[in-house]
Each structure stands twice: as structure tokens, then as C-alpha cells.
């Protein structure tokens, strides 16, 4: 399954790539943003992704744009170091497409989805020290409930944590299917918001495993450091926690020589949501360095 980048047209329009410019695609994934940027102008893209699986998509895209595309397998909190490692000091723009990719969700062995039972992993970087199995089978009940509430917004977080603790006392929880069943037993299904009861808890665990909010904060700070005057940072987020980090960081940057490109987040059109249901929760925020 190929990942469809959300708000692609809006991102490229706001970025407005120019010939001779240098851009960073901080979340390469399937290469959708990078491809469109490279098609739009005779520029160079430095791509970053912590998932080694993306090398396949990078190699394919490189054939179309030899000498103009580079990849570093790294976290975007290391963005500044990556840019410097390529011999570049400042760039003209940085784009972020947050969250999981369609490829990650489709691969049951990665553990990101409960649609098909797979390993309790959820690591975006295969060398990361902690995974979902560690969270589910070792984290104390109170900490577990707090994570599920804070990162997932799950109002029944205490019930979910209690159900997981009770289940792991009987035997180790080893796969996403079993975990989803345990969560569903603790969360009443809502008639008003008919999402799967496991959705919020899976999101919370994924954020914990990958330290996503701290990574995002560090990535935005690094992007601001490497940006030229006139350069832009664009971020597409998919849940309120991510969006809050972006909004607050952009607000603080406005006191440091930056200006918002759009005061309100840009949302996907009805047509895009119809063609790509994943886009429905997408929000694009953009900021430019003006001094």
C-alpha cells in the first residue's frame, strides 16, 4: 500500500518551491511530498525518516531525480545535525507530515493497527529500546492509565489500565488482537462516536513508544534554527496533541522573527476526504522566517 500524503496541493502551494532552493522533507515516508517538490522546481531535497523501510521508496524516487534527492535515516529531532552532515547550513523550507504512514498501518507485523493481529511493536525506528509489548506488560497501572488518558484522551483510561493489568497477570500479552479485545472489554462502545474502543489507547501507546510529542517539539526547534530568512516551516498534524504542540511553538516563534502564513489551520477539502478518508483529521499550519 502506497501512502497518500495529506493536503499535498496546499503544502506545495504554501511552500512555493523555487529553482536553486534547498528543502527538507522531515518525514519522507513514501516520498509523496519530496516527489511533488522536486517536480515543481529545479531544487534539492534532503529527506529524513527514522523508518528504514523507506529506503525502498527513496531508491525508486532517486532514479527520477538523480543528484537532487538525499536521505538520512534519523529522527527529525536530529534535523539540524542531518542538514549539517550534508554540508548545508541553511535551507529554504521544511515540511512535516506527522503520524503513521499507510505502509506502517498495513503491515500487521509493525503493530500499529488492530485491524489485523500482529506483534506488539509500534516502533517507527526498529532500533528503539522500547516497544508496545514493554508498555503493556511492564508499565505500572497508574502510569499506564495516565499515558492512556493524556496521549489518547481516553475517558475510561483507568478501566483500560485495570483490564490490561488483570490480563497480564494471567499471561503475557503478545499481540495487537489480544490487546484490542482486552481494551474493548473495558470501554463501552459509543453510539454517538462509533469509532473502535481500542483506537484511543492504541494512539496513546504509539505516542509513548516513539516519544512523539517530545520529538516533534525538538524537530520544530531544529527546523527554525536551519531556516533562511524567507524560508518556511509547514506541518500537517492529525490529532489535537500534535496540533497543540505546533500551534504553541509557532506562536512563540512569532516573537523571534517569524510570521504565520495562515492564522487558522488549513483543512482538507471534501473531495480530498472522499478520495482519502485518512485526510479527514489533517490540519496544516505554516510559518515563515521574516527576519
Swiss-Prot record:
Q: Which principal EC class is assigned to this enzyme?
A: transferase
Catalytic activity reported: cytidine(1402) in 16S rRNA + S-adenosyl-L-methionine = N(4)-methylcytidine(1402) in 16S rRNA + S-adenosyl-L-homocysteine + H(+)
Picking any one GO biological process from the record gives: rRNA base methylation
> Which UniProt keywords are listed?
Cytoplasm, Methyltransferase, rRNA processing, S-adenosyl-L-methionine, Transferase
Q: What is its EC number?
A: 2.1.1.199
Q: For this UniProt entry, what's an example GO CC term?
A: cytoplasm
Question: Per the record's keyword annotation, is tRNA-binding included, yes or no?
Answer: no
Could you cite one Gene Ontology molecular function of this protein?
rRNA (cytosine-N4-)-methyltransferase activity
Residues recorded as binding S-adenosyl-L-methionine, renumbered to this chain, are 31-33, 49, 76, 97, 104
From the record, what ranges are coiled-coil? none
One short Pfam family name for this protein? Methyltransf_5
Q: Where in the cell is it found?
A: Cytoplasm
Homology family: Belongs to the methyltransferase superfamily. RsmH family.
Explain the purpose of this protein.
Specifically methylates the N4 position of cytidine in position 1402 (C1402) of 16S rRNA.
PANTHER family per record: 12S RRNA N4-METHYLCYTIDINE METHYLTRANSFERASE, S-ADENOSYL-METHYLTRANSFERASE MRAW
Protein known as = Ribosomal RNA small subunit methyltransferase H
User: What is the species of this protein?
Assistant: Anaplasma marginale (strain Florida)
Gene encoding it? rsmH
